């Protein structure tokens, strides 16, 4: 309906946000359009003060309720219009279609609050939640929980005219539940096929909403010891069917847990307490907004998901590498030893008897198998081979039949033997490979030469701050100051 005369505009005098929707719009649509001629009603307002209200949740097709929503924003500004489209119109329309909020700013007792802080998907409050902002603006997609809520309302509605969709639904492969040790990273992987051969896009989204009347997961209490609620944010769909928790870049830095995050934080953490983490593997056969070059049709896309449970136990963990925590040299043809803390993962409940060790030549792509199906006993000795040669290696230990993992913290250089520092000591025997020290002095006997040892006396205090760097004095006692 186009209003051609200003005098006929029923909204011209409704300058307050609380009067933009509700009865004026409902009355206008029912009189001018007719109740039987529309399924949902929504009015747009051009204003410098963005706002919105759905007037209901799940009211499509509902007489006297379905036409009460408004979205307001600066429609003349291309940047703000994008915000209007996603953060306001799609958000309020989502409410009309039956979706609740997914953010955790307060406990709304809906079971849909599966994203920490402000959330980042359409039904969250990204960008308007202060310290609780996960990011500045919402991403242009609905959380799988929102999709499920909307589909339930749409399916139950009485007014839609249903049309067949030629596009077949993707088929998700078998997924398994796992028990993992506390304070340990893990890796989620799923598979799916499409009967039509469509390009598939994937997400892993957590599906833990706080219990009614209990906590909310805000920046103040987001931590690895949460006993309920989400511990990981939603990430945009991509062609990758896997997700590391936390993200691999954090794992490589040894930052497995996160507390009190802000807008530039990852909002991802491992769990240090016993709990069940529910995850959904979400598969879509259409990209967001821009079609892929291989997509030749513009038909309706499908979204499907399947759930898994990751049980975190207090009886094991943390599973972690205990060797190669700092820069290390491995020499081709020489023996090397890797060690790790089994941390009762070989016992019930985790029951990991055998592990694989994977090596990354580039420090992050773990495609080379260093050892396969070896005992989970905390140690492995092998001979370095030429195909491992690299200046930036790392390794990952993970069970043969589980999803948790651990990565060493230091860079590994693999090379043939030589004498890098020219001090007359071959590198494989030199206790300070990069700095000349022909005397091989090692005061604390830790295998690291004094000239490159950050703690010469081995008392746990760095040389730079140790008030007696060559004599162990852990308490740093200094009676005369």
What are these regions (language model features)?
Residues 178-182, 186, 271, 324, ...:
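Hydrophobic beta-strand core residues of beta-sandwich domains
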């Amino acid at each position: 309906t186009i209003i051609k005369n200003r005098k006929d505009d029923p909204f011209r005098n409704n300058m307050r946000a609380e009067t933009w929707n509700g009865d004026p719009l409902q009355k206008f649509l029912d009189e001018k359009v007719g109740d039987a001629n529309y399924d949902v009603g929504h009015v747009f307002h051009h204003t410098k003060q963005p706002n919105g209200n759905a007037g209901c949740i799940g009211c499509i097709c509902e007489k006297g309720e379905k036409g009460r929503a408004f979205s307001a924003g600066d429609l003349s500004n291309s940047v703000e219009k994008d915000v209007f489209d996603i953060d306001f119109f799609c958000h309020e329309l989502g409410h009309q279609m039956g979706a609740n909020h997914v953010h955790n700013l307060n406990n709304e007792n809906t079971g849909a609050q599966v994203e920490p802080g402000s959330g980042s998907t359409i039904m969250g409050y990204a960008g308007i939640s202060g310290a609780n902002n996960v990011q500045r603006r919402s991403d242009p997609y609905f959380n799988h929980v929102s999709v499920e809520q909307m589909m339930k309302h749409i399916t139950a509605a009485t007014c839609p005219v249903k049309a067949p969709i030629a596009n077949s639904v993707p088929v998700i492969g078998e997924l398994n539940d796992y028990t993992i040790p506390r304070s340990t990273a893990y890796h989620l992987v799923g598979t799916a096929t499409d009967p039509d051969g469509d390009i598939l896009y994937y997400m892993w989204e957590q599906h833990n909403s706080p219990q009614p009347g209990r906590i909310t997961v805000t920046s103040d209490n987001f931590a690895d010891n949460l006993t309920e609620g989400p511990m990981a944010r939603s990430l945009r769909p991509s062609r990758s069917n896997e997700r590391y928790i936390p993200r691999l870049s954090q794992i490589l830095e040894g930052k497995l847990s996160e507390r009190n995050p802000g807008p530039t934080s990852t909002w991802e953490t491992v769990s240090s307490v016993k709990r069940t983490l529910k995850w959904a593997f979400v598969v879509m056969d259409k990209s967001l907004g821009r079609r892929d070059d291989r997509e030749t049709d513009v038909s309706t896309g499908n979204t499907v998901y399947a759930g898994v449970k990751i049980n975190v136990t207090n009886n094991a963990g943390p599973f972690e590498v205990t060797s190669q925590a700092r820069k290390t040299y491995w020499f081709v043809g020489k023996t090397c030893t890797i060690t790790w803390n089994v941390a009762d993962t070989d016992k019930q409940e985790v029951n990991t008897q055998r592990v694989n060790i994977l090596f990354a030549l580039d420090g992050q792509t773990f495609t080379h198998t260093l050892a396969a199906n070896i005992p989970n006993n905390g140690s492995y000795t092998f001979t370095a081979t030429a195909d491992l040669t690299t200046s930036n290696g790392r390794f990952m230990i993970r069970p043969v039949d589980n999803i948790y993992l651990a990565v060493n913290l230091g860079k590994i250089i693999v090379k043939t033997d030589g004498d890098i520092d020219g001090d007359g000591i071959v590198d494989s025997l030199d206790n300070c490979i990069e700095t000349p020290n022909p005397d091989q002095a090692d005061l604390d006997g830790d295998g690291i030469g004094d000239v490159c040892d950050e703690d010469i006396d081995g008392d746990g205090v760095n040389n730079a701050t140790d008030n007696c760097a060559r004599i162990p004095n852990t308490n740093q006692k200094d009676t005369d100051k």
